[in-house]
Amino acid sequence: MKKVLTLTALSAVLLSSTAMASGFHLREQSAAAQGNAFAGATAGAENISYTYFNVAGLTRHKGTQMNLGMSYIAPEAAAKNVHVVNNDGSLGARGSDIHNIVHAAVSPNITVSHQINDKSFIGLAINTPYGMITKYDQEWAGSDHGITSDLKSATITPMFAYKATDKLSLGVGMQIQYVWAHLTNSSMGKQIPVVTSEGNALDFGYQLGALYEFNENTRLGVGYRSQVRHKLKGDMKATMNIPLLNQDISAKLDTPAMFSVGAHHDINDKWSVMAEYQRVFWSSFKNLTFVGDSMNYTGKPYISQVKENWRDTNFWSLGTSYQMDNQWKLRLGVAYDQSAVRFKDRTPRIPDSDRIWYSVGLGYQYNDKLSFDAGYTYIKAHKAKMNTFVTENAANSVNASADYTNSVQIFALSVNYNF
């Protein structure tokens, strides 16, 4: 039997508090843009890190430039009122409140650009656009639903932008994306303490962008990052060295497409305002399914499935910037980030919920070549209730419920150098 592991969105409980974007998308790719809660990121092009949202923005940056950035993501998350019910209706377990489910993480990024001539520009970006790590205690009441969820990624994007007219710029990029996934959970009502599934893949996508400058004060940008369809290869192992569970697996993991549109307007020499809309196409995430080529104790294929049924999400943000003097710039922003998960589809790996961003940032122009940016964001997520069902087969299924609360702080720094 063909081994399949459909991981169309390897995600984890409160991942959105770690990444603070719906699903497992890490929006933190620009310290400058973060100061405005990413308002106008698709049109801003204040430095080359904005090309993550719109590759056409390369044409606003003359000569050769480099941007180095890093975001420190510090989440707080808790699960309360944890209950597990067996398939026969009996109470399987009642767990204590769980804290420190998610852990701090670092998301680095680097972008370089070069102007070929008056119209043509090239660039290269290295980002970590998707990722999370979440870990429950192995003995928690809902361990059949998930213990550890770990997803890491790296994307290299060669870019090209062309100034078609004095007002219109167009850009294209190729995403070269690597992902690595690691999942653990108990099985058969904890008779098997830990089952580990792990895999990795390297696949490709693309990026498109357009930037229209109405005048020197007003510009509008449109960006698109394609879905990347990954085919992971790896293995599944059980801690008790059970041959039926120790086997090679293949996997499908699709990172979603994203469309964005942004506007930026300079009111005067001091004040600027900006707005952003982003849509992430999570609706391709229908279920999380493990199917092995060996039989379980019932004589049927080993199957573990959780229906996800994610929806496409919307992200809205508004921001303003104030140029305090020739060197210092103050940035402010607020955003509303919609959850990809509906109540009926929440799981311990993905109890996502809507959230609000509050951001502030500073820019410092040291000289004509060197500048620095810093951003801080506090994100408060709505309380998330979960009541979910997972099954390996008709004889072994459990229901888990819990209440989740989470928030996060994000600190971002970057340095930009114009050679």
Role assignments for model-derived ranges:
Residues 59, 74, 130:
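Glycine-rich nucleotide phosphate-binding loop and flanking beta-alpha elements
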Residues 17, 32, 62-66:
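A generic secondary-structure signal marking the coil-to-beta-strand transition
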Residues 1-21:
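Gram-negative bacterial Sec-dependent N-terminal signal peptides
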Residues 38-41, 65-74:
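Short strand-turn segments of transmembrane beta-barrel domains in outer membranes
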Residues 22-37, 41, 79, 84-97, ...:
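Outer-membrane beta-barrel porins/channels
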Residues 18-20, 27, 60:
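Extreme N-terminus of proteins, especially the signal/transit-peptide cleavage junction
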Residues 41-45, 51-64, 112-116:
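Outer-membrane beta-barrel pore proteins
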